[in-house]
Structure formats: C-alpha cells, structure tokens
Amino acid sequence: MEKYKIDKIFKLLSKEIPHPKTELKYINQYTFLISVVLSAQSTDVSVNKATKNIFKIAKNPKEMVDLGEKNLKKFIKTIGLYNSKAKNIILLSIELIKKYNSKIPKEFDKLISLPGVGNKTASVYQNAILKLPRIAVDTHVFRVSNRLGIVKTKTADQTQLQLEKIIPKKWRKDTHHLLILHGICYLLNTKFQTSYYKIHLKC
C-alpha cells in the first residue's frame, strides 16, 4: 500500500483513538513484563484480574520466586496456558536475579533469551517501556493490518517486518495499540466498514 494511504488510515485511527496505550495494569517495569507474558492468548481483562492480587505480594523477581510456581498457578488458573506461564515466570525471575541483578535488560536479544519472552513480548516491552519504535504483532495486529490492506502477509513475523518497513516513523510508536484497540472497538461494528475500510480504498 502507498505510504500516503497508510498515513491517511493512521490519521483516521488516531482521531478515533487519540490516546492509544496498553490496557494492562502494572506497577513497574518488571510487573509490566510479567503482564505481557501472561497476556499471550489471553485477554487483558483476565490478566488484570489475576495480577491485581499477584502484584500485592510479588512485584519484583525475588518476591515472585518466593511466591513460587505452585502458588502462582493458583492466581492465574483462569488464564490460558497457566501451567507453562507460571513455570516460565519463575524461571524468568530467577534468571533476572542471577544475570541482571533483578533488572530487565534493554537489548532485544537479551529479552528474547528470557524464559517465556518471545518476539512479540519483547517488542511490546521495548515499545511501551523503552519508547522504541518497535511494532509488536499478535493475532489482532496481524488480522487488522491485513484486513485494512496495509500489508498482505501470512504470518506475524512477516507482518512485523513489513509494518516496520512501511509505517511512517511518526506512527510507529502507536501502531501496535492503534491496531489492537481498533480491532477491539470497531472490527465487528459496521462503522469499521464505512469509516475505515471503505474510505481507505477510495484514497
């Protein structure tokens, strides 16, 4: 898609969603990373419901390790893949303590080396916390960006590469949240067809 069309789409999106930001609730950088790990294949609502209680007693790596995998599972059993997520969160916390003095590394390659942290999670963290122009792509961003015609891709990785190549720099910081929130608010609404989809085709 031509860049002027992409720019027009994002101008429309930014008018509908003037303050795009994560809906995950968190206290600090560590709790944000944990929330993103938990959000894989789960809703932000279900994650926030669980972390509201978790973060009262475990808001740093040491406290999470002290909580333990078994107890953590009790808090997140309503979240998808809770067994593997609990295991990864404890392993992640141990690694942060041993390798990084309980701090979260900034480098992408170090982030994705942490248990339970993949490309999407690392990109979301760098975008939201470090304010880097990373465009994290999950199933929502993949679906919406293809449906809008911004890209024509078959995988999330392909989508991220294409979006980071073609999205104007001024929109990259907010691309992830604009597309996600647009998908949640408008994709199943007729307004999506009339206000966005049809308009950009007529550009």
Task: Describe each model-derived feature in a short phrase.
Residues 2-203:
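Catalytic cores of DNA base-excision repair glycosylases
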